[in-house]
Amino acid sequence: MLHILGSAAALKATLLSFGPWTPLVYFLLQTAQVVIAPIPGGVTTVIGGALFGWYKGFLLSGSAAMLGSFLAFGLGRKLGRPFVMRFRDRKWVARLEALEEDKLDRFLFFLFLCPGFPDDFICLASGVTKITFRRFVWICTIGRLPGFFLIALIGAGIMKNDPVQLAL
């Protein structure tokens, strides 16, 4: 199983082997990768764009990642600080918790906009802050979806060998 997750080509081939179930399996994988994070989300999003085209790839990867983000937030909220601190040092989590609400909103939004930042963990850690679930949903959705759009577009460009999409 790990060899499949470690190779984009193997992952793509495995997904395609599910035939008409490929979109559902992809959706579940993308959701799970946010919550349990065995592979970077950028890899699965590129594969989604390559498999399904930029539009369907964006819809599948973005909606699955949002669901995973909300589940990770819920896990952080339900299981609390001791659980979250298993994945990051105590000081980092304490700093996040100490941010005032307006600063926390801006900080989370900025982190979600930064490509390559471990925003899956941010979703988990946000569960131990004072932010409400509703507010988290808005910030996460607005902050994360642009990145999923661009990465799905790149994945679709790879399949079409489109230099404009690849240049993005």
Regions found by a protein language model. Give the residues of each.
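Hydrophobic alpha-helical transmembrane segments and immediately flanking/interface helices
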Residues: 125-145
